[in-house]
From Swiss-Prot:
Protein name: Cysteine--tRNA ligase
Database matches in NCBIfam families: cysS
Binding annotation for Zn(2+): 27, 213, 238, 242
Annotated positions binding ATP: 274
Subcellular location as annotated: Cytoplasm
Underlying gene: cysS
Cofactor note: Binds 1 zinc ion per subunit.
Placement of sequence motif 'HIGH' region: 29-39
Signal sequence range: none
InterPro entries: Cys-tRNA-ligase, Cys-tRNA-synt_Ia_DALR, Cys-tRNA/MSH_ligase, Rossmann-like_a/b/a_fold, tRNA-synt_1_cat_dom, tRNAsynth_Ia_anticodon-bd
Source organism per UniProt: Pyrobaculum islandicum (strain DSM 4184 / JCM 9189 / GEO3)
The family this protein is said to belong to: Belongs to the class-I aminoacyl-tRNA synthetase family.
Length: 473
């Protein structure tokens, strides 16, 4: 598989430091408001990327953080709670972290390896800052804040391809008392009365944003790890500053091999913003459309390109999802009508879609082409395979169905055909019991188990001593 690396501006062969283990970190939300469709695009892409790596045989350790203390959270708490904000500010991140898990579940995003929170790692961050001060890469300002000295790190700007002189002239950096350089950034922010704080050797305060992600990613994944991701808006200054901190702390050029960024999402040609009043929340969209339709809508655009979000696109994706389910449902039910041997080479033609599907994902995660191949296979199943089902063996029909489901699993669609977790172990146990009953020629009881499972939507397919099962909603 080849993937575009923002650090090198090239599409590169994907390799990992540890064979068959892919370690990655994706910057998570600052939980101070509702998630919007731009957030969804980022997390769905990395979920598809993770699923494809797993299909290739990798164990994937994906870490996603929560920045659960930040100026935005503090300001939101003041708006909602007034003078009680100091006591109740934690209610804000808790509320929106809960929403994160609710929305990602509806989007069928698989759970991460870890979800570290800033507030649970402050002690580690203080230790990092102490080390950076000792090494001469950070300095203490008169108010007790600690700043990272950008000029001390060679090749600053390597990720965003900008020079320090240009950044100083045009960077969006607010001047702060105690800074030696406008580009220097806070590792530790001194306490403001009425706001949350933690102890440190310098003053009461809280950690800075850029430091937080470096500490949490390397704590869970080690350094260097394989890939670091997020939205394209994080390239500068956030990811640039992460690289600078890690260079100073570890003495390595890059603490992540691949930097992967997802393009902007626009509404009517403009980025979403509160001032324009064009923010579309995930809750709003998922109250009207399925998570699978939204996943397909995201996947119809290449992850690195800007994506224009429209409800027309979402309806197109919804219609596509219906076709995908029709192919699955009808082929699952038609398996019983398959013949004993193959009379036509339908499987070879069907599996060409799978070959093209995986070829597209191998080529820098080209999900638009992958979606078209999955959709093409669905249409082929409906238009051709089902009409000639009696001319292929049941095993061949099941091979086609399994490959189709395998492709859908990578994109995270057809998820509603999955056996509910609370049923899955029971089904497996009943299939094993039924196999023993068949061996003992207790066919009446074996047939009863098949019948009862069918009533739950679980269809059993016997091929000699082997039994496969499919699930219908």
């Amino acid at each position: 598989m080849r993937i575009y690396n923002t650090a090198t501006r090239q599409v590169e062969e994907f390799t990992t430091y540890v064979p068959r283990l892919a370690r990655g970190y994706v910057c998570g939300i600052t939980p101070y408001d509702h998630m919007h469709v731009g957030h969804g695009r980022v997390y769905v892409f990395f979920d598809i990327f993770r699923r494809y790596l797993e299909r290739l045989g990798y164990e994937v350790r994906l870490v996603i953080n929560f920045t659960d203390i930040d100026d935005k959270i503090i300001n939101r708490a003041k708006e909602e709670f007034g003078h009680e904000a100091y006591k109740r500010w934690r209610e804000i991140p808790e509320r929106y972290i809960a929403e994160y898990f609710e929305m990602t579940k509806k989007l069928y995003i698989k759970p991460a390896y870890a979800y570290p929170r800033v507030t649970e790692n402050v002690e580690d961050m203080v230790k990092w800052i102490s080390t950076l001060v000792e090494k001469g890469y950070a300095y203490v300002a008169p108010d007790g804040s600690v700043y990272f000295e950008v000029a001390k790190v060679p090749n600053y700007g390597v990720l965003s391809r900008q020079k320090i002189e240009e950044l100083v002239a045009g960077a969006r950096v607010e001047p702060e008392p105690g800074k030696r350089n406008p580009l220097d950034f806070a590792l530790w922010k001194s306490w403001t009365p009425g706001e949350p704080w933690w102890d440190s050797p310098w003053c009461p305060g809280r950690p800075g944003w850029h430091l937080e992600c470096v500490v949490m990613s390397t704590k869970h994944l080690g350094a260097p790890f394989d890939f670091h991701g997020g939205g394209a808006d994080l390239i500068f200054p956030h990811h640039e500053n992460e690289i600078a901190i890690a260079r100073a702390y570890f003495g390595v050029d890059n603490f992540a091999r691949y930097w992967i960024h997802v393009g902007y999402l626009t509404v009517r040609g403009e980025k979403m913003s509160k001032s324009l009043g064009n923010i579309i929340t995930l809750r709003e969209v998922l109250s009207k459309h399925s998570g699978e339709a939204l996943r397909l809508a995201y996947a119809m655009s290449h992850y690195r390109k800007p994506m224009e979000f429209t409800y027309e696109l979402l309806q197109q994706a919804e219609d596509m999802a219906k076709t995908l389910y029709t192919a699955y449902d009808e082929l699952s039910q038609a398996l019983r009508d398959a013949g004993e041997k193959d009379q036509e080479p339908l499987a070879q033609e069907a599996l060409k879609y799978a070959e093209a599907f995986y070829g597209a994902l191998d080529d820098d995660m080209s999900t638009p082409e992958a979606v078209q191949q999955l959709y093409g296979m669905a249409r082929y199943i409906i238009s051709t395979v089902l009409h000639k089902i009696e001319k292929i063996s049941r095993e061949t029909a099941l091979t086609i169905l399994n490959k189709y489901v395998e492709m859908a699993d990578v994109l995270g669609v057809l998820e509603r055909r999955q056996i509910p977790k609370e049923l899955e172990e029971v089904v497996k146990t009943l299939v094993e019991v039924r196999a023993k009953l068949r061996q003992e020629r207790q066919y009446q009881l074996a047939d009863y188990i098949r019948q009862r499972l069918a009533e739950l939507g679980v269809e059993l397919h016997d091929f000699g001593p082997r039994t496969y099962y499919t699930y219908r909603r």
